[in-house]
Structure formats: C-alpha cells, structure tokens
C-alpha cells in the first residue's frame, strides 16, 4: 500500500501515471523524494512518456510461479491496506505542497546550474575570441613593421645607388676637365676631316703632303628619346658605351619608362650588352654620332 500511496501522491501532484510509475521503478520504490529527484532530472528525456517495457512471457512454469507470487503479494497488499489508514485531505495537501516546493527547488537548482554553465561557456567563447583578435592584431602589426622596414631599406639602397652614380659622373667630369682643361662641359664641334682651306701655292712653295688621319680624344653624342626630344653630351673617345646609357638613364625627363636599347640608323646597328663594354672609339662613334633609343 505504501507504493500505491506514493504513486497516488505523485499523480495528485500532477504527474502522469506513466512518469510516476517510471520514477518509482527507477528508484526502487524508495519513496517520494527519490522519485521526485528522478522526475526532475529526467523530465526532458524523449522517452519519458513512453510506457515501461513489459517483461517477456516465460515458460508455463514461470507463469505459474508468477501467478502464485502475484496472489501472495495481493494478499499481503490487502493485509497492509487493511492496516494502513488513508491520508486525510489536510495531510494530502501538506504532502503535495512539500513535494511542489521540492520540485521548485530542484528546478531552481537546475536552472542555476545551467545558467552558470552558460556564463562559463560565454566567458570561454569571449576569451577565445579575444585571444584570436590579439593574435591577428599582432600578425598585422608585424606585417606592417616588416613592410615599413622593407620600404626604408629600398629607399636607402636607391639613395646609395644615386650617390654612386653622382660620384661617378663627378669623377668623370673632373677627369675630363683635368685632361682637356674643362672643355668637356662645352659643346665641341666636330672638326672637318677632309676640309682643307684652298690656297694658291706660290711657285716657290714646296709641295704639301696629304694630312694624316687625326686621332680624336673626345666625341659628341646626341641621343634621341622615344618622344622625339634629344640629349647631347661630350664623352671621351675611350669611354664605354655603358657611360652613354647611364647618362641617358639619369637625364631622361621623368626617368626611362622601361628597358631600352641604343641603335644607329646609318649604318643600321643595334648595340648589344656586349657592345656596352666597348669604347666609343672602337664602335665608330667618334668624333660625332647620333644614337636612337628603342624599347626592348
């Protein structure tokens, strides 16, 4: 009768008979409080409202034994029922109230526990997000710092290269000034090789021999750029063609648009990288020459 009383109490508290029977079976009929604890913990189970599994039928002997046991239990239950007095309405009300308070307490405890778990999960999520943001920001700062260092290094290398070029040009100018008394900065008109002033030889004048070919120490180079403009400069006859190319690169308005070649139209010739190491005299560019710039 105690089990029936507990089952009835659970049903009176609003639980279905299926849930109440499951709770009592799962807790071994230990009383209302264990059953209530079980119901609170398993109220969200998907099979909470499914009927309990029925024990399969056994042999005829087992059936008979079960029948005998059932009869005995019923007899004992009847005896117990006769001995136990039913609860009064006031007792039922008190018991129900106490059980409802227990249910509310269990629910509050569960909600508080779930709330703490959610707060902890949110803390972990935020902490993880902050760590990722810090790592990302650090990587961006490192990339920006590296890019700035690369730009500073490139600018320094460009500055040093320009200084070397300026120093070389200054040395070349000083060398030309030392050799030719500063005449290298002034345009030099090419001397006529075959023009000889006409003179009337006197009968007593000796016969003049043909002039020997003159060796030139300087040459005047004019370079025509892609836009039709021209650059002119005087170079030593023994300077390499690379000096002319360097002069063009440094004095091209706005800088050269890209790699270029030097050529002559008559005779038609495109100068190679190997020619850049040869002196102007050897390339036939003395005493004057016109070079044309062409894109590679």
UniProtKB/Swiss-Prot annotation:
GO annotation, biological process: negative regulation of proteasomal ubiquitin-dependent protein catabolic process; negative regulation of protein K48-linked deubiquitination; negative regulation of protein ubiquitination
Cleavable signal peptide: none
Subcellular location: Cytoplasm
InterPro entries in UniProt: UBA, UBA-like_sf, UBA_UBXN1, Ubiquitin-like_domsf, UBX_dom
Residues in UBA domain copies: 1-42
Region annotation (Disordered) ranges: 43-216
Name of the protein: UBX domain-containing protein 1-A
Lineage: Eukaryota, Metazoa, Chordata, Craniata, Vertebrata
């Amino acid at each position: 009768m105690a089990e029936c009383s507990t089952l009835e109490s659970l049903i009176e508290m609003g639980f279905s008979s299926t849930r109440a029977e499951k709770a009592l079976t799962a807790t071994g009929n230990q009383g209302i409080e264990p059953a209530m604890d079980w119901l609170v913990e398993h109220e969200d189970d998907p099979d909470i409202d499914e009927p309990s599994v029925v024990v399969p039928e056994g042999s005829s002997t087992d059936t008979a034994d079960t029948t005998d046991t059932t009869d005995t239990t019923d007899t004992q239950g009847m005896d117990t029922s006769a001995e136990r007095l039913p609860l009064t309405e006031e007792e039922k009300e008190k018991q129900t109230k106490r059980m409802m308070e227990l249910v509310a307490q269990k629910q509050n405890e569960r909600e508080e526990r779930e709330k703490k778990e959610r707060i902890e999960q949110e803390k972990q999520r935020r902490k993880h997000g902050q760590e990722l943001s810090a790592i990302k920001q650090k990587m961006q700062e490192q990339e920006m710092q590296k890019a700035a260092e690369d730009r500073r290094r490139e600018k320094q290398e460009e500055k040093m290269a320009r200084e070397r070029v300026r120093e070389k040009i200054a040395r070349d100018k000083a060398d030309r000034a030392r050799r030719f008394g500063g005449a290298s900065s002034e345009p030099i008109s090419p001397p006529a090789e075959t023009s000889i002033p006409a003179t009337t030889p006197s009968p007593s004048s000796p016969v003049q021999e043909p002039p020997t070919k003159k060796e030139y120490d300087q040459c005047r180079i004019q370079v025509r750029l892609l836009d039709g403009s021209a650059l002119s400069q005087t170079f030593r006859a023994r300077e390499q063609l690379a000096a002319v190319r360097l002069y063009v690169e440094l004095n091209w308005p706005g800088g050269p648009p890209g790699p270029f070649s030097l050529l002559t139209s008559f005779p038609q010739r495109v100068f190679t990288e190997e020619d850049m190491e040869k002196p102007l005299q050897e390339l036939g560019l003395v005493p004057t020459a016109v070079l044309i710039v062409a894109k590679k």
